[in-house]
Amino acid sequence: MTVQTTKTDLNKTLRVKKDYLEKNRKRYKVDATGKTLWRLAASIAIKLTGKDKAWYNDFWDAGDYVIVENADKIATTGKKMTQKIYYRYSGYKGNLKSMTLAEKLQKNPTDVLWYAIRGMLPKNKLRDPRMKRVKLIVGTTTKYDNFKPISL
């Protein structure tokens, strides 16, 4: 989409129709092997929100789809595998459960990256629709190759 502006309308908000946003969503494919967890999550969150686009507005859902392969082979820096702790609490007394990052990666490898991405998105009504556009895969797959994803 090319937008022509003149000196008089530089202060006006660029309006893009919802149909255009939905039809022109790109698909990105990321191989998570050896990549740092939080840096990878931050770059995925930028693609999901659409902050890399010229017509970004925080109240529009202008983001793209992201497919992450080898989500179980992410890396972390320092001693985070043993010192980073995830907590769950059901609300009952004495029912606080804790799990380290290494334990969580063994139990469900995609949860770690999913929660990291979710934590980096804005806490509003658009977070759940944006999270539906993330596909986390353990290993590799050719299931999404018909969309011709762009590799990051």
Where do the protein language model's features map onto the residues?
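Hydrophobic, well-ordered secondary-structure segments
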Residues: 113-114, 118, 131
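Charged phosphate-binding loop/patch that engages nucleotide di/tri-phosphates or the phosphate backbone
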Residues: 127, 131-152
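Ribosome large-subunit tunnel/peptidyl-transferase-proximal elements
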Residues: 2-115, 125, 147-152
